[in-house]
């Protein structure tokens, strides 16, 4: 896991709460607007990837 990223509490597609570190983080914003930050996570149980919104203060 990358050391620069911090774990975020997310809900996995299986419906469980887990503290995971996103594999990739990006901003999703229309031109000239604030937008949101999205993270790509991997479900530790199923191995499937899913996206989840991140807090606004999360470093990219």
UniProtKB/Swiss-Prot annotation:
Coiled-coil intervals: none
Family that this chain belongs to: Belongs to the Cren7 family.
Role summary: A chromatin protein, binds double-stranded DNA without sequence specificity. Constrains negative DNA supercoils.
Modification(s) after translation: Methylated at multiple sites, to varying extents. At least one methylation occurs on Lys-16.
Main location (coarse class): cytoplasm
Molecular function in Gene Ontology: double-stranded DNA binding
Cellular-component GO terms for this entry: chromosome; cytoplasm
Positions of modified residues (N6-methyllysine): 16
Oligomer and partners: Monomer.
Superkingdom as given in the UniProt entry: Archaea
Organism: Saccharolobus shibatae (strain ATCC 51178 / DSM 5389 / JCM 8931 / NBRC 15437 / B12)
Record has DNA-binding as a keyword: yes
Stated name of the protein: Chromatin protein Cren7
Keywords for this protein: Chromosome, Cytoplasm, DNA-binding, Methylation
UniProt key word DNA-binding: yes
